[in-house]
């Protein structure tokens, strides 16, 4: 999907029509990326909304992983397309930046949401306030749930049930979160 022809074909639109509507292929790809990122963010938000008010930041991170997987399972083509057309930065410029002002490159809604949750969980537990630490924890979290989502939608695990995927995701997220707690010496919720 790196080219606009593939993106237009997946959308069921002729390439000349798509390019005309979006003033060239770069605008088409950016609009596709924003639309798919919005769908991913909505799935993440749905999973986070089921948590009780005041839950520990680590619980929100786990719910975010479930939301990412939910999006991949609900729209596997959109999930793969989002990854193919992603053009945004995933590196935070500072620990305290929320993705709104200092960030020279748009991270996208879903990735900004993940970054903010990880930062908040680190802060909540008095962990180290370093952009590098923040980035490595985001990368570990994203890579783990993204890998599982890939395996579940287009990979070797694609023929299992949703229960299987979410049970496996729960275990994967628990391992990642425990690693985060151990490496950063964070406080676990009571």
Named regions from a protein language model:
Residues 74, 120, 124, 141-160, ...:
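Amphipathic C-terminal alpha-helical segment
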Residues 1, 15, 19-45, 62, ...:
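An amphipathic alpha-helix adjacent to DNA-recognition modules
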Residues 55, 89-124, 135-139, 166-181:
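Amphipathic alpha-helical packing segments from all-alpha helical-bundle domains
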Residues 80-83, 90-91, 127-130, 154-161, ...:
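Short, hydrophobic secondary-structure boundary micro-motifs
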Residues 62-91, 111-115, 145, 149:
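Helical hydrophobic small-molecule/effector-binding pocket
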Residues 4, 8:
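The alpha-helix within a helix-turn-helix
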Residues 10-14:
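Short coil turns linking two alpha-helices in DNA-binding domains
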Residues 31, 35, 45-77, 105-109, ...:
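Hydrophobic alpha-helical connector segments
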């Amino acid at each position: 999907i790196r080219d606009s022809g593939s993106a237009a074909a997946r959308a069921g639109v002729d390439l000349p029509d798509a390019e005309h509507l979006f003033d060239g292929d770069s605008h088409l790809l950016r609009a596709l990326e924003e639309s798919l990122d919005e769908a991913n963010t909505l799935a993440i938000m749905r999973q986070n909304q089921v948590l009780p008010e005041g839950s520990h930041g680590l619980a929100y991170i786990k719910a975010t992983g479930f939301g990412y997987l939910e999006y991949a399972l609900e729209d596997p083509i959109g999930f793969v397309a989002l990854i193919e057309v992603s053009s945004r930065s995933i590196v935070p410029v500072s620990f305290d930046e929320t993705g709104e002002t200092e960030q020279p490159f748009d991270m996208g809604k879903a990735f900004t949401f993940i970054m903010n949750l990880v930062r908040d969980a680190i802060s909540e537990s008095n962990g180290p306030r370093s952009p590098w630490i923040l980035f490595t924890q985001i990368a570990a979290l994203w890579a783990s749930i993204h890998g599982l989502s890939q395996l579940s939608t287009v990979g070797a695990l694609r023929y299992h049930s949703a229960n299987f995927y979410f049970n496996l995701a729960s275990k994967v997220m628990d391992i990642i979160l425990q690693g985060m707690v151990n490496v950063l010496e964070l406080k676990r919720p009571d």
